[in-house]
Amino acid sequence: MAGTFPAEKVVRENRPEYVLESFFYIKPWQVEEMSKWKMFLLDSGAFTFMHGIEASSKPVDWDGYLGRYIDFINRHDIQHFFELDVDIIVGYDAVKRMRARLEAETGKKSIPVWHRSRGLDEFKRLCRDYPYIGIGGFAIKHIQPSEYGYIRRLVQYANACGVRVHGLGYTKKDAVDFGFYSVDSTTWTTQVNFGGLSYFNGSEMVVVRPPKGMIGADYRIRREYALKEWIKYQKYLDTKGKWRG
């Protein structure tokens, strides 16, 4: 589950197995709950940070942000955390320098995030150097559905190398068949934002949309209900995992 920071009550009561949260948004109550989850993944929140800075017209202090990220990881002994994959903003060479500092000052390997712009050779290199990598670009449409077959083959390659792959922003029905070790997205909030609702029917999530021109009742109630249902779905998917590593 990703983006659960505003839903303390539901998360505490229903206890998801796996949680991803952005460093930019993470709350103290989530830190308290971490030990109860099977796995916690920390996203750098770099894009959110950058957009906030852009709105204020201030220069982006990447060194300062990275320093705070490192401090949080060390203070709370975070085991799984992503690099600052801001290639399209600062270039991949700068990303690699930040990754090197991140790993040197935490004493742990980060989860690098492969983007299509990095190329096939870099994907293979990451598979040689890291036990756990991410693939980004689904949520922002840099990877189109017509390219999913290619991505599936990349994941198969990584699995054959014994590498775990996280699909960032991908929770479609066929996520299990990709061979991803883990996936995340904030899909659980999407239909709620547009007035709809989603529920787990025992094997998949079903979306219920309001009649045209109407918006569903109380947003908070729908959001809490949707999160509960997605936690059920998460636990179901956990029994269906097909990671081959």
Annotate the PLM regions:
Residues 57-60, 120-128, 170-185:
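Catalytic cores of alpha/beta
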Residues 191-245:
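C-terminal accessory extensions appended to soluble enzyme cores
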Residues 25-35, 87-101, 118-122, 140-156, ...:
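Active-site-adjacent beta->alpha loops and helix N-cap segments on the catalytic face
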Residues 1-99, 233-245:
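Non-catalytic, usually N-terminal nucleic-acid engagement modules in DNA/RNA processing proteins
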Residues 24, 47, 137-139, 170-172, ...:
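Glycine-rich phosphate-binding active-site loops on the catalytic face of alpha/beta enzymes
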Residues 114, 136, 145-182, 186:
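Glycine-rich adenosine-cofactor-binding loop
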Residues 112-143:
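Histidine/lysine/aspartate-rich catalytic loop segments that bind and position anionic ligands
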Residues 1, 16-20, 39-41, 78-82, ...:
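Structural preference for beta-strand elements that scaffold enzyme active sites
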